[in-house]
Design a protein with these regions (language model features):
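Receiver (REC) domain switch/output surface
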Residues: 119-122
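Short acidic-hydrophobic, aromatic-tinged amphipathic segments that line or gate anion-handling sites
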Residues: 106-112
Length: 122
């Protein structure tokens, strides 16, 4: 396990799990640079490049965080076999991703265990 200011990092089989901390309950603009930097750093270091972002503590994010997710996803996709999934989303956050059809790009899982099992299996 590795701790940063805004996220904790875990390994589960071949999957790197990035769990946003309670400081990220409301992912507003003033946090995005720091959170984005930590996510990018962790995504870059993930080997193999299979990452689950656990958003269980996040109740709100806007378009700025979606842009961060795109940057993280692009970084992961640069490596062979790169995959990104999101898990444990609060209803509002899940709805945002479904309305924008980003759930087609990034698989959404109800629980961290479901996400890790799916990515370890494939």
């Amino acid at each position: 396990m590795s701790d940063m200011a805004y996220l904790q990092q875990f390994r589960d089989g071949n999957v790197t799990v990035l769990e946003l901390s309670s400081k990220c309950r409301l992912l507003e603009e003033m946090l995005l640079d720091a959170v984005g930097q930590e996510l990018m750093q962790a995504a870059q270091a993930a080997l193999p490049p299979i990452v689950v972002i656990d958003l269980s503590r996040t109740e709100f994010f806007g378009s700025g965080f979606i842009e961060v997710l795109f940057r993280v996803w692009n970084r992961i996709q640069q490596k062979e076999g790169g995959r990104l999934a999101l898990c444990a989303l609060q209803p509002y956050c899940r709805e945002v991703l479904e309305i924008t059809h980003l759930d087609k790009l990034w698989p959404l899982y109800e629980t961290r265990a479901d996400a890790v099992a799916a990515l370890n299996k494939s």
